[in-house]
């Protein structure tokens, strides 16, 4: 017996981890600076760590009350009903829930190229088809309604990413509204705001209450520093509320993740520090790296270095882990996550040495 034909399904390619690189390179993990996965360099909120410790002896229980409490807290934060908040194992989980709720076999989704691979992966898992709209490095991967609508052909779901991964460009709220206005009544416009805390643009969540064709994805992985716990959520139109119970994987958002997220929501100081550091670091990288960069509103910077694979490999030899963006269809670009001030300065210095030695990436 064999699994079904999965030849159209491409595996997700994550950034490499510290331990993995240290083993491969024979390096001390403590000497490595990991800037490949857009993680929070400050780690989780101390309050979240305390909550994990406090509730660790309860993991034999299903996360019913913690899930309910987190849903209520998020609904209060965004001024929506609890039925509109779909808590999930990471924002990826919410993408799957929306696929389950929206897609019939053969339905299409429209996704950005380059972009986050899981939009297409989830659609194909759920027997959907995938179309793309192109974002170009020639204009800094600028996002607007015209770009999306020129590729739109009645797809069931249209994915927007603001800030966009891997470029960091944003989709202004007026452009989101224009896309929702121009698409068909049965098209759901999904705005992925995984990096929303780092941007200086308005969230699209208020649109969810204005209309029934917009949903928004959010996560605790980035600004809240809970990537390892896999906890996220979506805010959906009120009319979609009752679908959650029919598509949600039971108890998929685990007890410790829900408890940590509840505590992290109250630690506004930790989030503010994380955002401040990211904004400082992305400006530092843009100013000091010896390569052209794309203006970013995320906790990362996309740089054009000429040969992403060579630069990423050589950078690892110097103890800096960055993301080779060849898997995004950008073989000339690397993505550099924002680190601490000290880590960012040191990483940029080592990257500049790498670029100089390779004769690549010098600013035009």
Swiss-Prot record:
Key words, A-Z: Amino-acid biosynthesis, Aminotransferase, Histidine biosynthesis, Pyridoxal phosphate, Transferase
Superkingdom of this protein's organism: Archaea
Swiss-Prot/TrEMBL catalytic activity: L-histidinol phosphate + 2-oxoglutarate = 3-(imidazol-4-yl)-2-oxopropyl phosphate + L-glutamate
EC supergroup of this enzyme: transferase
Pfam family, one: Aminotran_1_2
SUPFAM superfamilies xref list: PLP-dependent transferases
EC number(s) given by UniProt: 2.6.1.9
Gene3D superfamilies noted in UniProt: Aspartate Aminotransferase, domain 1, Type I PLP-dependent aspartate aminotransferase-like (Major domain)
Annotated pathway: Amino-acid biosynthesis; L-histidine biosynthesis; L-histidine from 5-phospho-alpha-D-ribose 1-diphosphate: step 7/9
Residue list for modification N6-(pyridoxal phosphate)lysine: 222
Record region (Disordered): 1-46
Gene Ontology molecular function: any one: pyridoxal phosphate binding
Signal peptide, first to last residue: none
Disulfide bonds, paired cysteine numbers: none
PROSITE patterns per record: AA_TRANSFER_CLASS_2
GO annotation, biological process: L-histidine biosynthetic process
Annotated InterPro entries: Aminotrans_II_pyridoxalP_BS (IPR001917), Aminotransferase_I/II_large (IPR004839), HisP_aminotrans (IPR005861), HistidinolP_aminotransfase (IPR050106), PyrdxlP-dep_Trfase (IPR015424), PyrdxlP-dep_Trfase_major (IPR015421), PyrdxlP-dep_Trfase_small (IPR015422)
Regions of compositional bias (Basic and acidic residues) in chain numbering: 17-33
Essential cofactor(s): pyridoxal 5'-phosphate
Keyword Coiled coil: no
NCBIfam families: hisC
HAMAP family per the UniProt record, alphabetical: HisC_aminotrans_2 (MF_01023)
Assigned protein family: Belongs to the class-II pyridoxal-phosphate-dependent aminotransferase family. Histidinol-phosphate aminotransferase subfamily.
The protein, known as: Histidinol-phosphate aminotransferase
Native species: Halorubrum lacusprofundi (strain ATCC 49239 / DSM 5036 / JCM 8891 / ACAM 34)
């Amino acid at each position: 017996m064999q699994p079904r034909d999965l030849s159209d399904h491409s595996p997700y390619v994550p950034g490499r981890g510290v331990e993995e690189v240290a083993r491969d390179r024979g390096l001390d993990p403590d000497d490595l600076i990991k800037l490949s996965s857009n993680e929070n360099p400050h780690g989780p909120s101390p309050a979240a760590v305390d909550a994990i410790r406090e509730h660790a002896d309860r993991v034999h229980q299903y996360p019913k009350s913690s899930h309910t409490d987190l849903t209520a807290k998020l609904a209060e934060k965004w001024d929506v009903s609890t039925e509109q908040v779909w808590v999930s194992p990471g924002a990826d989980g919410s993408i799957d829930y929306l696929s389950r709720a929206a897609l019939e076999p053969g339905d299409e989704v429209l996704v950005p190229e380059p972009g986050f691979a899981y939009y297409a992966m989830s659609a194909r898992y759920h027997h959907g088809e995938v179309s793309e709209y192109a974002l170009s490095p020639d204009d800094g991967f600028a996002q607007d309604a015209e770009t999306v609508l020129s590729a739109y052909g009645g797809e069931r779901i249209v994915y927007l990413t603001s800030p966009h991964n891997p470029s960091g460009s944003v989709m202004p709220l007026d452009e989101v509204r224009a896309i929702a206005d121009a698409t068909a009544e049965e098209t759901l416009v999904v705005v992925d705001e995984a990096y929303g805390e780092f941007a200086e643009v308005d969230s699209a969540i208020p649109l969810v209450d204005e209309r029934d064709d917009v949903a928004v994805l959010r996560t605790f992985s980035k600004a809240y520093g809970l990537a390892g716990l896999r906890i996220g959520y979506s805010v959906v139109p009120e009319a979609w509320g009752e679908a959650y119970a029919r598509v949600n994987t039971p108890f998929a958002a685990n007890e410790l993740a829900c408890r940590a997220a509840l505590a992290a929501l109250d630690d506004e100081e930790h989030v503010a520090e994380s955002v401040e550091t990211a904004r400082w670091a992305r400006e530092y990288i843009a100013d000091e790296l010896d390569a052209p960069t794309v203006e970013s509103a995320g906790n990362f910077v996309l740089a054009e270095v000429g040969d992403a694979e060579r630069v990423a490999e050589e950078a690892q030899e110097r103890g800096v882990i960055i993301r080779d963006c060849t898997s995004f269809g950008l073989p000339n670009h690397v993505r550099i996550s924002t680190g601490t001030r000290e880590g960012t300065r040191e990483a940029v210095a080592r990257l500049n040495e790498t670029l100089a030695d390779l004769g690549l990436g010098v600013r035009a």
